[in-house]
A protein has these predicted regions:
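Short, amphipathic alpha-helical interface elements at domain boundaries
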Residues: 1-247
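Extended alpha-helical interface modules used as scaffolds for assembling large macromolecular complexes
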Residues: 214-529, 533-538, 545-548, 559-577
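Short, exposed beta-strand "edge-strand" segments with a Pro/Gly-rich flavor and a Y/T-containing core
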Residues: 9-14, 90-94, 194-198, 335-342, ...
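Helix N-cap / beta->alpha transition motif
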Residues: 94-105, 158-159, 199, 275, ...
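Primarily hydrophobic membrane-targeting regions of prokaryotic envelope proteins
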Residues: 22-25, 63-68, 79-87, 164-167, ...
């Protein structure tokens, strides 16, 4: 048993709950760890494996400070964080297990890094174009996730099938994982049950201007940076990022990914220089997109509607208009001038999401430079007339019922093999199913039946197939039960508790102890005892000098030291009352 754990255990017992929770989280402690008391916690935190896991997480300044402390120098201002991580004692010195682990690693070196060179006009223009492309690609990604959650692999990357589907929109496949990471940091997407889903905040972000979208993304990107890259409210020069976690073998790959996201957001130019709009962010100020906005194409608020059921936007369509138009039509091409196509399915989808024929036609009339062509008006009105021919609702008995004035439709649904999982049964009033109302509705919709959910009052209901979760930061482990358990086992006398642990360890290892006993007359006597048992408040063992078995009251033991056989009466560990 390590004697170095004893002072750490005392410090842990005196620390507030919040400080303990922060320490356990930073050191990667499981909330359900089977520690019995603070001595267990201290020993676990000083185990070589635990220390080896903690060191790679130290940013450069703390790694340098810890190395200074190991070398016998003052850790300086970074002593506080290292003490909070239980890598330094409260006096600023490292415990021997920490010193041993640090000594085995290379010396970290810190150096001043000047700010990056400002971008010239050409490099800034390319960075602005990339930022614009990234914002548009993220909007596509969020819209796709709103319609159908995106499948994730076990490691958190997008599944290959999803990448192929997204790449069909024109987004470069190699950027998709970085785009998803940017969206997650911004709270637009969230990973749930190995699926990437759009959050509640995604809808409002989609309706913002391109510069406002970019502002939200880059400020979230900054907030999510690892603490080793932060400089106050801003970040360190990007040229210094690679050196910030000197003891982490995974950092080069992580740093490369973070730098690529910064490049995608237009915060780093291709030549490594810094565009004008990145400077306030690096310095910790709010984002100022004015200089970026000057390099972005002007957004338009009108489109050309054509007789072939297509729409042409002569420039980047304002995001709010683009989002609504894409709920009604399929976007066929995405560029500074985009094209959209209206189909019966796309209009039906809009009606399903809550639009009406009147709202669709009013919207198109408002943004069209060419009026509404007759073929498009006919498509909308005909689709609207057909929509809702099939009504889905829950009857008084709790079963799902499918009704329609068109008996032919009911007959078709009754024999449709695609609907077999619903087990539809025909009766005089239509079809019934044991499946839930929403399940029946979406299955019919996927099979392209003009279905509509109606409530108890017979009015249409709009149901979101993939309700967006609220954006919340990942829940931190709950260490309160663990801390409460450790405090319950915390006795009033830390010295006595430590002695008990030393004696238990000696019995388990059948060690030879040099025991100091307090005699009834107040004097002290030392015995060499081969520990054999502990119980009932008594220590049992063979007295080496007298070669007899002795039973000693634990309350009379002042101290116990494990004797190193190779050193005669040398001591290797100490427990004192």
């Amino acid at each position: 048993m390590s004697t170095h754990a004893r002072p750490l255990a005392v410090w842990l017992a005196q620390a507030p709950d919040a400080q303990l929770a922060a320490l356990f989280e930073a050191r990667g402690v499981r909330a359900d760890v089977a520690w019995s008391d603070f001595f267990d916690a201290a020993e676990a935190l000083l185990e070589p494996a635990s220390i080896e896991r903690a060191l790679p997480r130290l940013p450069l300044t703390e790694a340098v400070a810890l190395r200074r402390s190991v070398n016998g120098d003052d850790a300086g201002d970074d002593a506080g964080p290292l003490i909070a991580l239980a890598l330094l004692r409260p006096d600023g010195t490292p415990a021997p297990p920490v010193a041993e682990a640090v000594t085995a690693r290379q010396d970290p070196t810190a150096s001043e890094t000047p700010p990056p060179e400002p971008s010239d006009e050409s490099a800034a223009a390319r960075a602005a174009e990339r930022a614009f492309t990234t914002v548009a690609a993220l909007a596509d990604l969020v819209l796709l996730a709103s319609d159908t959650p995106l499948a994730l692999l076990t490691g958190g990357a997008l599944a290959s099938g999803e990448k192929r589907r997204i790449a069909a929109t024109g987004t470069a496949p190699e950027t998709l994982d970085d785009l998803a990471a940017i969206a997650v940091d911004a709270g637009l997407l969230a990973a749930l049950d190995r699926r990437l889903v759009a959050t509640e905040s995604a809808d409002s972000w989609l309706r913002e201007s391109a510069s406002a979208r970019w502002t939200g993304l880059v400020q979230a990107f900054r907030a999510a940076l690892p603490r080793g890259l932060r400089d106050g409210d801003g970040w360190l020069p990007t040229t210094a990022w690679a050196a910030q976690y000197p003891w982490s073998t995974a950092w080069p790959e992580q740093c490369s990914a973070i730098a690529e996201r910064a490049r995608l957001l237009g915060l780093i130019a291709d030549d490594g220089s810094e565009p004008e709009w990145a400077v306030p962010l690096r310095e910790g100020a709010p984002a100022d997109p004015a200089s970026l906005q000057r390099m972005l194409p002007t957004e338009v608020d009108r489109i050309f509607l054509q007789n072939d059921l297509t729409a042409i936007a002569p420039g980047p369509l304002q995001p709010a208009l683009d989002v609504r138009l894409r709920r009604i039509a399929v976007r066929e091409s995405a560029a500074q001038a985009s094209s959209y196509r209206f189909t019966a399915d796309s209009v039906a989808q809009a009606l399903t999401s809550g639009e009406t024929a009147a709202s669709i036609l009013d919207f198109l009339a408002e943004i069209s430079l060419t009026g509404i062509p007759q073929p498009l008006e006919y498509l909308v009105t005909q689709t609207d007339q057909r929509h809702g021919l099939v009504r889905v609702f829950t009857d008084a008995s709790g079963r799902t019922r499918v009704a329609s004035v068109d008996a032919t439709l009911l007959d078709a649904m009754g024999v449709d093999q695609a609907l077999r999982p619903l087990a539809l049964a025909r009766d005089a009033d239509g079809l019934t199913s044991r499946a839930g109302r929403d399940t029946v509705y979406w299955t019919l919709t996927d099979a392209r039946y003009p279905a509509m959910i109606v409530g108890d009052d017979g009015r249409p209901l709009v149901v979101d197939r993939n309700p967006a979760p609220g954006h919340a930061p990942p829940a931190a482990p709950d260490y309160l039960p663990l801390i409460a358990r450790l405090r319950e086992r915390q006795g009033p006398d830390a010295d006595a508790a430590w002695l008990d642990r030393e004696l238990e360890a000696a019995v388990r290892s059948k060690a030879v102890l040099l025991v100091e006993i307090e005699m009834p007359d107040g004097t002290a006597r030392e015995l060499q005892l081969e520990a054999s048992g502990l119980g009932g408040g008594r220590l049992r063992g063979r007295d080496r000098a007298a070669d007899v078995e002795r039973t000693l009251p634990v309350r009379s033991i002042r101290s116990a030291r494990v004797i190193d056989p190779s050193a005669g009466s040398g001591a290797t560990a100490t427990g004192e009352r």
